[in-house]
Amino acid sequence: MIDIKSFNEYPDIDKPRRLRKYVLIWCSKGTLKVMVDETELKLKEHEVLTITSGQIHYLKNYRKAEGCILEFTVDFFCKNDNDIELIFHNGLFCHFDLNEVIKIPNHGVVQTQLELIKKELLLKPYQHYISIHSRIELILVEINRAKVERGDEIWKPDALFLKFIETVRANFNKNYSLEQVARKLGTTEAKLNEQSKLHTGRTAQNVIYGLIASEAKRLLIYQNYSVKEVAYQLGFNDPFYFSNFFKKHAGISPKSYQSKYAL
């Protein structure tokens, strides 16, 4: 549900891992590198990186760095639509795999709240989960302020759009059509298209295609699957159709992509 550990407390943090949690990596001292899917990012002192649920990641060159990793599930944090919108505000955990390193000028706030979260989890005082939820809110607000201060455009998607993305991510193997996703969310295809165009400039169907292509890349890089197995994992009945789909969206065949990037 929620956990926080310093870098040296995590076993095998230098091995690729995938969590159905939202991950926040905080560097308080030194430097380290983080691989997220196929992208390498460098964190320096007082910088933070957010990783969306399902993204594969691991640390590199972190032995001399200090910091911690906070992980929490969507069920723990998102009690209402306001929580959903905060967690994805300004692309914090909804960046379509364009992870970014964020420098925090007012770093003392983040450092203090992370330390207090760790203390709450250790001692478990009365209503500690409520306290932790509030402290995560403070951290996310501080990160949002840092992004605004550096000139980033404010991006605040509607909760429905975020539920749409999460539904697709949670059901890759079912290969839901847009109609099926809309039905699960109790809305319409037209409404999802409206939200998708508003927040991404793309149709809802193209958002789905993009999410599937990103998931295919993860499976090709980090899992010991053949192209055929990846196709079936993503709900494609025809591996040839999957190969054409992947090449259209990635600009390279799945076999070539796997040969180029696989560990």
Sequence positions of predicted segments:
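Short coil turns linking two alpha-helices in DNA-binding domains
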Residues: 185-188, 237-238
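Generic protein-terminus/edge-of-domain signal
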Residues: 1-44
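Terminal helix-turn-helix DNA-binding modules in bacterial transcription factors
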Residues: 198-240, 256-263
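Short hydrophobic/aromatic patch on the recognition helix
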Residues: 46, 192-193, 241-242, 246
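Short, Lys/Arg-enriched, Trp-marked, Pro/Gly-tolerant hinge/linker segments that flank
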Residues: 100-103, 123-131, 141-185, 198-210
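A hydrophobic/aromatic-rich effector-binding and dimerization subdomain
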Residues: 62-119
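Flexible coil/turn residues that form the inter-helical turn or adjacent wing/linker of helix-turn-helix
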Residues: 39, 174, 223-224
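Short beta-strand His + acidic residue motifs that chelate non-heme Fe in jelly-roll/DSBH
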Residues: 33-35, 51, 56-63
